[in-house]
Amino acid sequence: LVDMKCLVFKVRGDYARFRKSYTTPSALTYLLIHPVAVRGLIGAVLGINREELYEKTKDIKVAVQVINEIKKDMQSFNLINMKSSDKIFRFPSNVEFLRDVKYRIFIKADENLINKLQSSLVKGEVVFTPYLGASEHIAKLEYEGVYNCEKLPKGQYEIISPVDLDSNTIDFDDSDILLTTDNIPIDNDKNREYTKYKKVIFATGENKI
């Protein structure tokens, strides 16, 4: 077993929108904050600029506990196409939001980054405004602590974070727990394009899989 330091904090917001890039003009959202978005949050707190964000956060390991149940809203907007100089086109678009979101974030990173992030969260100081997928959805952050964590051997465990369906076998004996699945991005490249996805399953609140 390998001992490591992991930092834990909560993030919440009235609304969130983690937009699926392939759903234009109907902008759907992923059902939870994903690792790429978490790295963006960390970058905002520490003041990492967009050009350096990938290199400085790519090695951060992320786990998420979805605390609040999934609540979605859909709103309709009339968008304006400004590409043409002589004609203006309006077209309707449905935009999906998550409402009343709350997550517990677990991260593992190098000691220097952990220390900087801990200091910022304890003081309540951020360099850039952290948001939940879109700049109008401001994130509220709450520091919880830095803890010792360990890498466990393969086996059967109860998990509070999303579980990769392709790499794990799930025991569905407890039928009273509502489980949700989604195919979320877990990695991106320097151009902020998603490069790797995982199909995950997760419970909400204090429920475990």
Question: What positions do the PLM features span?
Answer:
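Intrinsically disordered, low-complexity boundary segments flanking structured domains
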Residues: 1, 47-53, 92-94
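Internal, well-folded beta-alpha domain core
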Residues: 2, 67-209
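Short, surface-exposed loop/turn motifs at beta-strand boundaries within globular domains
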Residues: 2-4, 35, 57, 98
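N-terminal, Lys/Arg- and Ser/Thr-rich interaction peptides
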Residues: 2-23
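Extracellular structured ligand-interaction cores
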Residues: 6, 59-61, 100-102
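Beta-strand secondary-structure signal
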Residues: 8-10, 63, 104-106
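Charge-rich, low-complexity amphipathic helices
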Residues: 14, 31, 63-65, 139-144
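Glycine/small-residue-rich interface belts in oligomeric ring/scaffold proteins
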Residues: 20-84
